[in-house]
Amino acid sequence: MGEAMRILEKTMLLELSYPTSSTILPLLQDIKKSPKLFWLDTGLVNYFAGFQKELFGNEDISSFWKGKIAEHIIGQELLTLTDKVSAKRIYWIRDSRNSQAEVDFLYQFKGMLVAVEVKSGSNAKLKSLHKFMETANCNFAIRFWNQPFSTDIIQLSETKQYTLYNLPFYYACVLDQFLEKNV
């Protein structure tokens, strides 16, 4: 099965995204861990899910996906922000047997490592993001969601806090410009 997935990746139909447990640059993917599979064509994603007819004329495609398509769309937008054909999306996992934590994407911007979470609901928990930020050398993170722009100061401990920028999904295509102005 793994060989078939690698062939599909070489044909640029999908991407196998391997995790890292690092919170500093350079990021090294752990190819011994299970990868996330990202289809590179959203139309194929909808086709294989059997949602073509239902999507035409529908204003809210997330209702079919119950929010799960949001991570795919944001991942696609992050890929468009680079001109490197070989660019890979990387996600973070906590390297611990007793705890599972995952941050959806780690995005590199001007030598900084930016944690990016994608949440479709407004009351989503951010425990994994907080775990990442406890050890990361960064004082801000990004959450893409289906709500208006807002900013939160998250207090992790007496000595550690970070700014969480809550961006509407449609800000993904201008993430670099947002970071340029705000960090």
Each PLM stretch: what is its role?
Residues 149-183:
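Domain-level recognition of nuclease-like catalytic cores that cleave nucleotide substrates
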Residues 63, 115-119:
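Short, glycine/charged-rich beta-strand-loop motifs at protein surfaces that mediate ligand recognition
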Residues 90, 114, 142-143:
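A structural signal for isolated positions on well-ordered beta-strands in alpha/beta enzyme cores
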Residues 1-102, 107:
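Accessory nucleic acid-recognition modules appended to NTPase machines
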Residues 120-163:
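Catalytic cores of nucleic-acid endonucleases
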Residues 44, 97, 112, 121, ...:
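Short, glycine-/Ser/Thr-/acidic-enriched flexible segments
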Residues 107-115:
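Active-site beta-strand-loop-beta-strand hairpin of nuclease catalytic cores
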